[in-house]
Amino acid sequence: MGTIIRRNERSWAIVIISEIKVMLNGLGVKIKSAGGESTLSVNKKSMFPDVLLYEDEAQTKILQGWELKMPDVLITDEALIADATRKAKALGLNSFVIWNFTYGKLYIQNKQGFFEEAKVWDGTSHIKSREDVTTYKAEWLPIIKEIVMTVNEYLVNGRIVTSSIVNTISDGLMTELIQRNKELVAENIMIESSKNMQMERRLKVWWNAFHEEYDKDENNMYSAYAKSVLLNWTNRVMFANAIKKYHNCAYAIKDIDYTTSPNDGNNIIEHIVEQGDFYNVFKPLEFNEVIPEDTWIDIVDYNQFLIENNIEKIEQGVLQDILEKTVNTAKREIRGQYATPYRLADILCQITVQDWNKDCADLCAGTGTIAKAIINNKAQRIHRADKAFMTTWMSDKYAYPLQIANIAVTDIHALNIPINMFTTDIFEVETGDKIKIKNPIDGSDIEEIIPQFGTIVSNLPFVEYNKVADDEQEYIAQWREKITNSTGIKFTRKTDLYNYIPFKLYELLEKNGKLGIIISNSWLGTDIGKNFFEALQYYYIIESVLISNCKRWFNNADVIGTILILRKKEISIPDKTKRISFWLTNKDINTIEEEDKETLINSIVLHQVIDESVATMKEYSLSDIDNIMQYGISLNALFHNISWIKEIQEYIEPITKELSMIRGERTGQNKVFYINGETSIADKFLYPMLKSSRNIKKYSASPNMKAFCCNKTIEQLKEDGEEGTLKWIRKFSNDKYEPLAKSINYSPWYQMPSINRADLVTSENPDKRLFIAELNESVIVDQRLIAMKYKDSVANKELVFALLNSIYGMFAIEANGFGRGQGVLDISKTGFQKICMINPELISKEDAAEIIALFSKIKNRNVMEIEDELMNADRQAFDKKVLQSIGHEELYDCIKESLLSMQHTRHCVK
């Protein structure tokens, strides 16, 4: 990139700025200064107004921007007005002035957020050309003064307000710079990577690691990386300007001007690092120099704006606010789906840490929210900033999040204190290893030894098993073997990444050390989760488990979070008398008031329910949990009152005593085998089929299509003259009858079996209706349905069907799974086959007949949502009769309460 050339001659903008400064001298008005000279770029449209008015002489309180044009640009020019509007919004201003030497106009933002014309100056309407500007200077200068004084009047009466330098620097300008340059940079990176295979491959490796963080925002690798490049530059420029008062080496940031290139900029910042640390903030993102010239001008503009506005003169508290808001903007722009909200991080730290004087760590630090919460809580209790920082450790696998993390934990009052921050995969962190950090005073190296930690607090990465990076597969294989050797429990290859990390962290904790983690809720309702839970018991005392009963913790993610509080113990067989507290938080953690937050923390730390409107708890011993889970009830149900299960356990049996589970078809190519409409296939090869439960409204269901099931070879079909069927097969094969699609799961490929037929079905992802539907005839079903068949030994199918749909049957379905981000229930075929039902053998013939009769009143109507269903008089009579038939009608209200409570928790995340 070539050097950017600046104007040497004094532009009219500089003349106007100078004249305004002179006229303000000694006036005693609220407008104290004017500026803007340093950001008058000539190569492109600037990010900033040509003239800035300030409410203070230090130029930290921006009042208004002016956009200047020569007379050949009309004052009504739409592009001019739009440009001025954009700049005002970026600076957080509610007014602007446009001036073309012929006319002047003041615009003020109305209550609806639109800028509307407030005043016009036309005293120089005779100025028509650039030459006239020079000729009639003496006539337009008084108009400039008149505009300034009018603006001052609007300032005095409150119509015009000053913008906050905090929001301007950390939000408005950063967002503006990113939005107007993202696609330019993306295109440039794409062009350059087409010339450089190493660059292309590096970008793809980066995208594989980070793409999930951009799923809600960017689905294009180049746009996502462009955004990261721009944030890398804005974060570094802002941070250097913010700390230069305290670290003189950072004054070198002023050298990034219009005569420099991006490579020069990196070298200037590297010089700052050599003298004063903050390496994690100042580290350049790879390929950050691959930006177009126009983008570099914007970055220089941003830097010069910070210099001209004397950011270093802002008081410490405001600077701290700028740093914090910069972190928020960076997180928002990246839209990291699982970034930890600060209130959640603060609560997690306080319910986990036992001794604030000991070393604490977040080894999946991400953007540093948890580490910041640790430092803040330490500082409040031990009253020594140096010790708070010295005993807090943070690391992450990737360097980029640590740039934001370093800014997040930076304390303007404690800039000279080294930060224990390093880049390492969590599986590679070892106690006793040496790391090098920088002394922020002189840039010298400091060698630190990783200690055993008193506490580790982390939001573990929500990475599904099939998305784990290749470089971590080896670690996972090693830990799978270690866990099996220690516990006898085998983790399958479909176990998610977070399931392994607590076992690694065990090594890094001191004796009785505490671990507080946020993980996905999937472990609460799956076989894999059951293995995880049981293996944890060998390594840790599980003290508390928390989930939300009031909105989700992560607003921009579909993942539902849980908190686990663990205490390290000797690896040994679990003590089944140990008790676990299962907590429901009843306040929105992201908006919880301070008093309620304190109540929540007190409750969990003391294992005591203090205010049920804030949090409720259910407590179980490990042996209680083992007993409950044998009835097909998941861990997810333990947050609710299910103590009544002890009263009913002798009256229930596994549903597999009455039903056989049927495997739904997984064809690999549905269009070959699922027939909906006319076809040339012979009728004898077509069987009734149900693909989905979406349209099932009642307790009975009918097939909604046909399935192609052929048990004959091609030769047999030819011999039998089955030309229509052969025609269908040829539609999906070559001349040799070999399949065009390689994903088909049958052998021979066209022979889907017809023997797997179901009598009953239910959905894998039910929502507000919980029921099992009976099919009018035995049908083939798709894999997405949970399908069952009556066993030949069943004497009374009507009774079994009724019992499956009783209040206990609905509870059994709800209690078997866990909630997903969309609010639906997630249950699996393997999990479902473990649920129990009321044992029909224990019901008398008389009661059975009455139950069937009562069920017939609801069987033929539409299934209602649970709340409505339970309010229905016929339903109540049926459910109470079922419970009365086993001598436990008194449990009706308990079961109803449990069912409604579980549904509320599942739906509150929407």
Which residue ranges define each predicted feature?
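Acidic-basic catalytic patches of nuclease active cores, encompassing PD-(D/E)XK
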Residues: 1-40, 44
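Catalytic centers of nucleases
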Residues: 32-57, 452
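Signature of N6-adenine DNA methyltransferases within the class I
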Residues: 43-46, 91, 96, 103, ...
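Charged, often flexible domain-edge or linker segments that flank or initiate folded functional domains
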Residues: 49, 54-56, 60-69, 74-85, ...
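P-loop NTPase catalytic cores that bind/hydrolyze ATP
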Residues: 222-249, 458-459, 499, 507, ...
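Class I S-adenosyl-L-methionine
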Residues: 246, 276-351, 819
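Polybasic, glycine- and aromatic-enriched phosphate-binding surface used to engage nucleic acids
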Residues: 626-853, 857, 863
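Amphipathic alpha-helical coiled-coil/heptad-repeat segments
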Residues: 806, 846-910
